[in-house]
Structure formats: C-alpha cells, structure tokens
A protein has these predicted regions:
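Interfacial aromatic-anchored transmembrane helix boundaries in multi-pass membrane proteins
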Residues: 31-47, 53-54, 58
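Small-residue-rich transmembrane alpha-helices that serve as helix-helix interface/gating elements
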Residues: 130-145
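C-terminal ends of transmembrane helices
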Residues: 26-38, 85-94, 145-149
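Hydrophobic alpha-helical transmembrane segments in multi-pass integral membrane proteins
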Residues: 55-67, 110-126
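Structural signature of hydrophobic alpha-helical transmembrane segments
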Residues: 9-23, 70-77
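Alpha-helical transmembrane segments
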Residues: 66-80, 135-136
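Membrane-helix boundary/juxtamembrane motif in polytopic membrane proteins
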Residues: 89-112
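Cytoplasmic-side transmembrane-helix entry/capping segments in multi-pass membrane proteins
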Residues: 39-50, 69-74, 98-104
C-alpha cells in the first residue's frame, strides 16, 4: 500500500524514480533498524502517509534548489544516530540477544551501503540516487530517535508506578 502511495506522490511531484528509490532504501533500513511505532493502526497509516509525503516533497525541493550540502550534513548526523541506536525493539516485539546482534549487524551493513550510495552520488552529482537515499536516512533517523525517546519515557513511567 505504501509503495503505491510513494509512487503516486512521485508521479504528482514529478519524481517517480526517486520515490521508488526512497521507498526501497527506507524499507530496507527500517526493517532491520526499527524505530517509532504508533499506538493504533489508523495513527500508523496517517503518520506513514505524511512521512512519505514529506520525504517526496523534500526530494522534489532538492530538484528545485541546491540543498545538497544540507541534505548530506543532516543525513550523516542521522546516520550516526541510527548506527548508535539500532536496532530498536518494541514491547510488542522484543529482541533477544541473538536477534539483537543479528539485526544490528544487518542494520550496519544496510546503513553502510546507503552511506556509500549517498557519498558516491554526491560526488558524481547523481541526484536521482542522492536525494532519495538522504531522505530515507533522515526519516529513519527521526523514527529511531523518536522511538528511543518513547521507549525511555515508557520505561521510566513504568518504573515510577511500580
């Protein structure tokens, strides 16, 4: 469903290929790194749609304005955050030690591949790959950071009630 949304937004904003690249790279890193999860399915659908829309708009803006240095800088900051926090499990799907190590390793590999794609596409000014990969790291960075804040808050709240 969300791939279709990304494609539709890509067609509307005239960045079809970029929207597909964004969605694929985001799904790869998200699947293994984890991050924020909404409480309800409806909230998840709304937030996911808005997140995809914001990223496609960001990609479109990168085609209109030279924001490559800003995208590169923000992406690298979020890459460090993802590297530190991944994988982020949830109370609904906690990870045991073996799973944690596996997901961390895979997350780092995927993150490294996306960073290489960003750097190479930045050097060669290949914006079709650069902007979508940056958008995927920015979104995942926001989600993993938000997820970590939510997790710490819930743990503190639970321990204060005990």
């Amino acid at each position: 469903m969300y791939l279709i949304l990304a494609i539709v937004f890509g067609l509307i904003f005239k960045c079809f290929l970029e929207s597909i690249i964004f969605y694929i790279t985001f799904q790869f890193i998200r699947r293994y790194a984890g991050g924020f999860h909404a409480k309800t399915e409806t909230r998840c659908e709304i937030l996911s749609t808005l997140s995809i829309l914001c990223c496609i708009v960001l990609i479109k803006l990168s085609k209109m304005y030279d924001i490559r240095i800003a995208l590169l800088s923000i992406s690298l900051v979020f890459a460090v955050l993802i590297f530190i926090l991944c994988p982020l499990d949830t109370p609904e799907k906690p990870l045991n030690d073996k799973e944690y190590k596996y997901f961390r390793k895979i997350s780092w590999i995927i993150l490294s591949l996306i960073i290489v794609a960003i750097i190479v596409s930045f050097i060669f000014k290949f914006n079709v790959v650069f902007a979508p990969c940056c958008a995927s790291l920015i979104l995942e960075g926001v989600l993993i950071g938000t997820g970590k804040i939510k997790k710490v808050y819930n743990e503190k709240r639970a321990s204060s009630q005990a």
